[in-house]
Each structure stands twice: as C-alpha cells, then as structure tokens.
C-alpha cells in the first residue's frame, strides 16, 4: 500500500525531541500559534507535518522563566518519507548504493519496520532542518502580528523569521547516551590510534567527518616526512646539497598524498552515499537583498540585484581594502625586522645568556601579532563579503575563502620569503620558521579549544545550580540540557580548521630544505589537535546540523596550489645554497637556467603523478558507471511505457470519431 504524507499522524503528544526552536521573548501569541500550525499542518496544506510542542507546559511557564523554547520531532514514517524527499542514498541488500525510496524500503540493508536505527540521528535532524527550511509562504502577505515583516509567495518562512528576529535560533539537540559512547572511542583516552570516522559521521554528519578524516590522514602522512627529516636536522644541518634529496622527496610526497586523499575520500563518501547525491538548485542566501522581481530561471518572485553593482563593490571597495590590509601586514613585518636587528645588536654587544634568549622574543611577538591580525582581518573579510551582496551561499563562501587565504598566506609567509630571498639569512629563516610554527600552534590550541572549554564549563556549573534549585515538577534533565545547549557557542563550520591545516602544510612544504624538523612539530601538534577538536565538537559548541559533502571542496585546490608554490621555493632555496653556487662560480646565468629547468621538471613530474593517479578507485568508477547505465535504462523503459499507453489510446479515439 502506498503511504502518503497526508496519512501521517501529527497529534503525538510525546516524541523524541531532535531540534529546538528558540523564539524572541516578546513574540506575540498569534505568531506562535501561526508558526505551530504551519509546522504541524499536512504537507498538502503547505505545512511541514512535523511534531511540535513547547519545552514547558502552561503551568511550568508560569512557575519558571518562560524561555520561548519549542521542541520539534517527527514520526518514523515521516522520517522515512523525508529521507526520500532529500535524496538520501543508502546501501541495498545487493551491496549497491541507491537513493532511498519508501516504496522499496525493504530492499535496503539494515531496514526493519521495528528498527529505529536505519536513519542516523544526524540524518533525522538534517531531514527536519530541510522540512523547516522548505516551509513556504502561501497567500500570507505578512507574518501574523508583525505587519512590517512582509511575506512573498514561495519564499522560505524560516529564513524570514530569522532575519526578522522573531526566531532567535534553530539548533539540533545532543543525544547524551550516543555522545558518551562516541567520546569513549574518540578522545577520552589519549593514544596513537585511528578515529571512529564512521561513528563521527553518524553523529555529526559527513562534512565534519570528512574534516576529521582529512586531519587524521594528513597527520599519518606527515610521519614519513618527520622520520626522514629528523636525521637530516641532526646530522647534515649545513649541507644544503644533501637537502636536495629531502626536498625532492617532499615535492613528490606532497603530490602523492593529495592524490591518494582524493581516492580515500571517494571511498568514504561512496560508502556514506554522499558521492551519489544530486546537487540541488541553490536558493538566495538569507542575507541577500535587492529589488523584488521575477527570476528568469525559476519564474518565481525574489529579490534581484544587478551584477555590475556587485562588481563595483568588489573592485572599488573590497579589492582596495584587501590591498591596504596587505600593505599594513608588510609594514608590520618591517617593524619585526627592526626588532630582530635590535635584539641581534644587543646580543652581540653583551653576549650573555639573557640576550641569547632575547633573540627569540621578536619572533614570538610577531607570531602573536600575526594571529591577532588574522582574526581581525577575518571579521573584516566577512563584513565585506556580506556587503558585496552575493546571491548564493557558494559564491559568498568562495569570495570569503579567497580573501582570507590571500591575506593569511602573505601575513604568515611574507617574512619567511623576505628572509630567504632578500636577506638570504638561512639561520634566521630556520629560527623564524620554528618560532612562527610552534607559537601559532600553541595559540590556536588555547584560543580554539581550551579557552572556550573553560568558559563552557563555568556556564554549565551555573545552569546545573539553577536547575537543582527548581521545585517545579518538570523533566529536569531535558530542561537542563536545552537551557545549557542554547547558550553554547555556535560552531561556524570547518573553515578555520582547514585554514589552520593549510597554513601548517605551508610551513612544512615551502621551506622543507631549510627546516626539515617542521614535519615533526606538525605531527605532535596534530595528535593534540585531534583530541582538542573532538572535545570542542562534543562539549564546547552546539551540535551542528549535518551537511552532506562529497569532498573537502575548494580546500583541495588550495592545498594543491600550495604544493605547486613549494616546488618553486625549494628549487630557489637549493639554487641559492653555497654548495650549489660553488659549482657555478662565474656564470650565474647557467645556474639560473639549471634551477628553472629542474623546477619545470619537478612540476611536470607533479602533474604526471596527478594525472596517473585516478581520483576515484577503479571499483567505484565501475559502480558509478553501472548506476548511470541503470538510470538511463529505467528512463528509457518509462518513456517506452508512456509511448505504448499513448498508442493504445489513439485507436480508441479514432474509433469514436468514426462512430460519430
């Protein structure tokens, strides 16, 4: 029997809460009632057909401080039909991956009518988020109770409620039992081990699981570099000609690990089903604004903003501002070099142990200033990118990433390039590289994990005391959980985490022939990073909504670009070494030609390796080709069925015409 959404029951008074909606304190009752009715209404009537109830009943709201918090869930059948609507891909009994449909649910591995574990909690929360975001305005002209909050047919109600300040936030709840199991296998025991990536994916979703998978992969990939770099550092410190072998290995290593990651990523995302998920049509991002008009593609009414105005904002405001920030970064760099000269002069005059320690102070101060500048610039870049008024979220993210990467690259590495190619002081280069790398790692650990964790612990203690003081007859556990989680910080995505790895990759690869110990420090940091990031996700931030991902996106290109730049810098550094210069004492032109030739040969080798190593393993390519073939065959059969039905109808119509 075919089950439709209209047949589902939405009157369950008790259900498993998955998502919390927080409304503003002064929201009017008619607005609350309207929102509730739209959420629980049947799909055919324009509702989401979800389960919805307040955290506190009327008596509890009178007894306690009314927080305007509401819980959202869904019945099992509603979840399964929602999984079909969002296009979730699951493993079938024949070990193939296919888009889930409720009609063929028995064909999927692990499905049972009495089993509630077929969909992960992250998938269930993603489905609820999808349904809430797809609540559309119908014939309403405004939000009830708020005449200034205009509504337009077909536009998302949730986005309008958020931008109007009526809805404060929407967030998924943690599952305490599942979270405890995940913590026990993930980070509670500090040890050299693989992470439970599939469990992370089941709890947090594919985007976060891919980050932790990449962090783990990158850390283990650094171990050969660290093992080889350690003896080079200890035994051949000044023999730059011997670093040629190490640098060449580094360049091949950086190419191979990035290509092998793409294969490993394809394996994971195929197993999770996200490699097969179709890309959906993007709607305007919440912050997009413009004059109301008709979209020429969708035919729907939405805000329109001329492209030339956006380009003017980018080239006349954003670009000059970025250039000004880059200039300021270079100015700060020159102040740092003045401090280095001052510290060196002081040490040469006195030669004491105190002044030998003082030699590292300018680099430490500069590293701290770099971190501060990076964070301040990030806020400015977000403001500018939002002001540019990009229509799509993907365009917004691409412009933001470009701004941040350019500034961070120059801010972090400009001083090292200046020391290497202008001052040509290899000793100072090693010292600066080591100090910048280690200081930035320590600061990131403190600012991103330990400080937020300490603040969250203090807040948690206050909430527990408040709940223990309550005399009301309520579900104290759920109440405490919701109150605690709503005050947690919001996880803003994997942007900063990937950026940290990107800069670390730069420190390791750009100047490997000068400081081979960088990989060892990166490995030590990343083992700590895995645990601190896990703690951050589980105990510091709100649980983020799951976001399906097939790869790490634009960051793959960023890492590949960094590996290409590292070829140029390492070849140039080796060409500048005294040992190599001694081979060409008279003709510098010959030296330059040979260095350029070697650099081109290594770049050619990189591109050959990248081409020779397929992005997807052979067995996955075969499975994808098979699925594409079956989809085309199914489409042909459907078309043939329609043609056959039309041919059957034609004789009947012609017979009627003859009879008349």
UniProtKB/Swiss-Prot annotation:
Membrane-related topology note: Multi-pass membrane protein
Membrane spanning stretches: 208-228, 241-261, 317-337, 353-373, 401-421, 501-521, 554-574, 591-611
Sequence ranges on the Extracellular membrane side: 229-240, 338-352, 422-500, 575-590
Pfam families tied to this protein: Anoctamin
Signal peptide: none
Tissue: Highly expressed in the brain. Intermediate levels in the retina and heart and low levels in the placenta, liver, lung, duodenum, kidney, testis and spleen. In brain areas, highest expression in the frontal and occipital cortices and in the cerebellum. Lower expression in the fetal brain than in the adult brain.
Membrane-side (Cytoplasmic) residue stretches: 1-207, 262-316, 374-400, 522-553, 612-660
Any single GO BP term: chloride transmembrane transport
One GO cellular component, as annotated: plasma membrane
Function of the protein: Does not exhibit calcium-activated chloride channel (CaCC) activity. Can inhibit the activity of ANO1.
Disease field: Spinocerebellar ataxia, autosomal recessive, 10: A form of spinocerebellar ataxia, a clinically and genetically heterogeneous group of cerebellar disorders. Patients show progressive incoordination of gait and often poor coordination of hands, speech and eye movements, due to degeneration of the cerebellum with variable involvement of the brainstem and spinal cord. SCAR10 is characterized by onset in the teenage or young adult years of gait and limb ataxia, dysarthria, and nystagmus associated with marked cerebellar atrophy on brain imaging.
Record protein name field: Anoctamin-10
Gene: ANO10
């Amino acid at each position: 029997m075919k089950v439709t959404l209209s047949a589902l029951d939405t009157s369950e008074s008790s259900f498993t809460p998955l998502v919390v909606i927080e409304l503003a304190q002064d929201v009017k009752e008619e607005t609350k009632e309207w929102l509730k009715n739209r959420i629980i209404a049947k799909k055919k009537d324009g509702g989401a057909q979800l389960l919805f109830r307040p955290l506190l009943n009327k008596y509890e709201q009178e007894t306690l401080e009314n927080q305007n918090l509401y819980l959202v869930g869904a019945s099992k059948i509603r979840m399964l039909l929602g999984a079909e609507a969002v296009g979730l891909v699951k493993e079938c009994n024949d070990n193939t991956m296919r888009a889930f449909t409720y009609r063929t649910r028995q064909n999927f591995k692990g499905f049972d009518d009495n089993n509630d574990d077929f969909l992960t909690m992250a998938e269930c929360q993603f489905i609820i988020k999808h349904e809430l975001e797809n609540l559309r305005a119908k014939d309403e002209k405004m939000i009830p109770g708020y005449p200034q909050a205009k509504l337009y047919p077909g536009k998302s109600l949730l986005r309008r409620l958020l931008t109007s300040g009526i809805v404060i936030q929407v967030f998924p709840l943690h599952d305490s039992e599942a979270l405890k199991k995940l913590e026990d296998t993930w980070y509670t025991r500090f040890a050299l081990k693989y992470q439970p990536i599939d469990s992370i994916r089941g709890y947090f979703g594919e985007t976060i699981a891919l980050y932790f998978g990449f962090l783990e992969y990158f850390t283990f990939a650094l171990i050969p570099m660290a093992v080889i770099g350690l003896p080079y550092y200890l035994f051949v410190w000044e023999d730059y000609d011997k670093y040629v072998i190490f640098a060449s290995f580094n360049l091949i290593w950086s190419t191979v690990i990035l290509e092998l990651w793409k294969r490993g990523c394809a394996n994971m995302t195929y197993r999770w089903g996200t490699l097969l998920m179709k890309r959906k049509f993007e709607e305007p991002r919440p912050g997009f604004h413009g004059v109301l008009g008709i979209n020429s593609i969708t035919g729907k009414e939405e805000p329109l903003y001329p492209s030339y105005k956006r380009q003017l904002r980018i080239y006349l405001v954003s670009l000059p501002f970025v250039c000004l920030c880059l200039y300021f970064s270079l100015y700060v760099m020159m102040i740092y070099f003045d401090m280095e000269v001052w510290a060196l002069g002081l040490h040469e005059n006195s030669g004491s142990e105190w002044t030998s320690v003082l030699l590292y102070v300018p680099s430490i101060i500069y590293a701290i200033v770099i971190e501060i500048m990076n964070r301040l610039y990030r806020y400015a870049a977000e403001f500018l990118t939002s002001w540019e008024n990009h229509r799509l979220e993907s365009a917004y993210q691409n412009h933001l990433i470009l701004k941040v990467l350019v500034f961070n690259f120059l801010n972090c590495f400009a001083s090292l390039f200046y020391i290497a190619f202008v001052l040509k002081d290899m000793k100072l280069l090693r010292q600066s590289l080591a100090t910048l790398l280690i200081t930035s790692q320590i600061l990131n650990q403190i600012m991103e994990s330990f400080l937020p964790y300490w603040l969250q612990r203090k807040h948690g203690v206050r909430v527990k005391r408040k709940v223990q003081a309550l005399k009301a007859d309520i579900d104290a556990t759920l109440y405490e959980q919701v109150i605690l989680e709503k005050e947690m910080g919001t996880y803003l995505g994997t942007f900063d985490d990937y950026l940290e790895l990107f800069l670390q990759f730069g420190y390791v690869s750009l100047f490997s022939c000068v400081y081979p110990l960088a990989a060892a420090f990166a490995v030590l940091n990343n083992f700590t990073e895995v645990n601190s990031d896990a703690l951050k996700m589980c105990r510091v931030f709100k649980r983020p909504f799951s976001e399906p991902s097939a790869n790490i996106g634009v960051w793959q290109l960023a890492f590949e670009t960094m590996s290409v730049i590292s070829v140029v810098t390492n070849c140039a550094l080796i060409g500048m070494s005294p040992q190599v210069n001694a081979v060409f004492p008279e003709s510098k032109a010959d030296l330059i030609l040979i260095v350029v030739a070697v650099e081109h040969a290594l770049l050619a080798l990189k591109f050959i390796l990248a081409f020779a190593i397929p992005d997807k393993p052979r067995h996955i390519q075969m499975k994808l080709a098979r699925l594409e073939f079956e989809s085309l065959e199914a489409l042909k059969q459907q078309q043939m069925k329609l043609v056959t039905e039309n041919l059957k109808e034609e004789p009947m119509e012609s017979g009627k015409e003859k009879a008349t």
